[in-house]
Amino acid sequence: MKLTLIQPSVGKIANKPYIKSWTMEPLALATLAGLTPKEFEVELIDERIDPLPEFYNTDIVGITIETYTAKRAYSIAKEIRRQGIKVIMGGIHANLMPDEVIQHCDSMLLGGAEGGIWTQMLNDFKNNKLQKKYDANSYFKKELDHVTPRRDLYANKGYLPLGLVESGRGCPFTCEFCAI
């Protein structure tokens, strides 16, 4: 099976390429790829660098969504879903605006993907049981210590020569007013 992970660009200006923004490695997507079961072939498309294909040769797509890329992410998801491909969305905007995001995808992840929830989502997809929403707060997060981001997916993409590292993840508390 094939999983395609997409980092949307900020947007598009008429008759010009997509707006370029920071070209640092999308560490969240490489971490997600590291959490993906080995039976999935993983492809990374970073729209800030790569053109999007007209037709997708994949089984399922994951799109990371930040508030400033939301409009573009919804447009990408609409086209992919039109091709009959399931779309999963997650990221900070999904946590902040879940009622909005869920209208544009087949499944949504709230919170971080570690702790077994990402594997559960992909297994549910394989078994035709993909749920509309998954809440990572209901999963025990023990998997992160063993996650190696798939930096091989960055090859030949022209990212800034920086090695991004996460020194911490989230927060152990579940305050209702916080998006972390």
Predicted regions and their residues:
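Acidic, low-complexity intrinsically disordered segments
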Residues: M1-I180
